[in-house]
Amino acid sequence: MNKLIDEITKSQLNPDVPNFRPGDTVRVHAKVVEGTRERIQLFEGVVIKRRGAGISETFTVRKISNSVGVERTFPVHTPRIAKLEVIRRGKVRRAKLYYLRNLRGKAARIKEIR
């Protein structure tokens, strides 16, 4: 039974997911359906967490919009993501960056890997 589940989930994995980690700044091109129309919505921010494995793996992106923090969680292998771009590589020493929720302005910046 497990082999069958593994084969099915392996066929559903998205092969062109870039290598990204918490602390990286990414731009997610998400497909949004409004009525009968489908359009692409950009969401750019810092990856604050990545959890799970395989088909159920998700990541959360945080951005500041109109001085309000907005977090959005995406499944890594969903067909609703048209494209995922890594803008900057961040240097962090944690896997979960929840502490960024309490920081404002320059304190919330993440050092870039050269």
Swiss-Prot record:
The UniProt entry, under SUPFAM superfamilies, shows: Translation proteins SH3-like domain
* Family the UniProt entry places it in: Belongs to the bacterial ribosomal protein bL19 family.
Question: What domain of life?
Answer: Bacteria
Q: Which GO biological process annotations does it have?
A: translation
Q: Which UniProt keywords apply?
A: Ribonucleoprotein, Ribosomal protein
The function of this protein is:
This protein is located at the 30S-50S ribosomal subunit interface and may play a role in the structure and function of the aminoacyl-tRNA binding site.
Q: Does the keyword Secreted apply?
A: no
Q: Identify the GO cellular component terms for this protein.
A: cytosolic large ribosomal subunit
One molecular function GO term is: structural constituent of ribosome
What's the name of the protein? Large ribosomal subunit protein bL19
Family annotation (Pfam families): Ribosomal_L19
Q: What organism does the UniProt record list as the source?
A: Listeria monocytogenes serovar 1/2a (strain ATCC BAA-679 / EGD-e)
Q: Which InterPro entries match?
A: Ribosomal_bL19 (IPR001857), Ribosomal_bL19_CS (IPR018257), Ribosomal_bL19_sf (IPR038657), Translation_prot_SH3-like_sf (IPR008991)
